[in-house]
């Protein structure tokens, strides 16, 4: 079976987002008419892959997300998974 996944990785709410704070501090230099209350920078990883079943695909995505894609000490993750046909 062939799959497409999007893994969303976000800093935990308790973790300060230095990059987001830097962007927020400078938004008005580019877009003077908006006032940003909160800005967080996140990551999205998109991948297509083959796996024997949807259950196995989810198991493997869990492992990848925990061990490779996210720093689980400071980040949370979730994903969308869909079966695709070529």
How should these model regions be labeled?
Residues 2-46, 50-86:
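Long, contiguous binding/interaction regions
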């Amino acid at each position: 079976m062939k799959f497409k996944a999007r893994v969303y990785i976000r800093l935990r709410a308790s973790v300060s987002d230095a990059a987001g704070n830097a962007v927020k501090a400078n938004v008005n230099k580019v877009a003077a008419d908006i006032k940003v209350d909160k800005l967080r920078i996140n990551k999205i990883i998109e991948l297509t892959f083959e796996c024997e079943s949807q259950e196995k695909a989810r198991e493997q995505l869990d492992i990848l997300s925990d061990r490779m894609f996210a720093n689980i000490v400071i980040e949370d993750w979730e994903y969308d998974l869909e079966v695709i046909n070529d």
